[in-house]
Each structure stands twice: as C-alpha cells, then as structure tokens.
Amino acid sequence: MKRVYVNEEWCLACHLCEYNCAFANSGMKDMVKALKGKKIYPRIQVEVGTDENSRAISYAVSCRHCEEPLCVKSCITGALHLEDGVICSDKEKCVGCYTCILSCPYGCIMPSEEGNVIQKCELCTKNENGQPACVAGCPNRAIVFEDRGVPSAEEECAFDEEGGAE
C-alpha cells in the first residue's frame, strides 16, 4: 500500500504541505478564497526542532495508517475504521470524545475546525486529488507517496525511537 513518507533532510519547514492539505480538504475551488486570512486546519503538521548536534531539523507529521491502529481500536462509536488500508473517519458517528487523539502514538489526530469532531489524514481519498495534496505541494520532494512494502512492527515504532521519519 502506498503511504506518505518524509525525508527530514529535505524539509525546509515552508509549511506548503499544510496549506495544500487545508485547501484540498476545504471543498473550495479557489485557494485564496479558501485560506487567505483564515486559521488553517491541515491534517499534516510541520514539526521544527533540533537534532542531537543542535542543528535545525524539520519534518512533516501525518497519519501513518498503522496496520493495527490503536485509534481505531479505541474509538467507542466506530467512527474510525479501515478502508483498503486507509484509516478513515466518519463525522456522522464521531461524538468528539477524543479517545482516538489520546491513543494515537504519533499525535496525528486533531480536533476539526468546528471543534466537535476529529480530523485526520485520509490520503486525500475523499477529495479530488489523485495523490495526497501535501505531496503534490511540496516544492522540495521532502514528502513522497510510495509503496515501500508493509512495514514491520519495528519499523512502525522507528519513528518514536529515533525521533525522525522514515
């Protein structure tokens, strides 16, 4: 299955992935009308920090679409579910208890703009893009959408242990 992968060496922290994500999920056709002067609510977040040598490091974080997702298991209403390997949310079933937010080990689920339900990356499966908008909008190809095979449990946890993306 294709997944979003990040190369933190190439990330410029320009936040264009966030803007492209917010626009793709806005339901509007004009980016300026959709985003100008508004707080954006992207499903991908750029994290900025320093590495062990005190050098600046930045990378984008979004849902890892885990094979055995804790968020889906913890969802009390069944609003989170797997569709062809993609963790999707059903806003009609979500009651805003945020149990999934607390259970996601990557911090990739967040309250929606409305604040009463959650939002998360669904790999742009519910909008008009052929690939995730964050990938298409990254000027440096720091974000890619590739099939690298099924990650082992150790690879799934590598993000947490090493403090970086694959």
Q: Where does each model-flagged region fall?
A:
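Non-ligating segments of multi-cofactor redox enzymes
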Residues: M1-E166
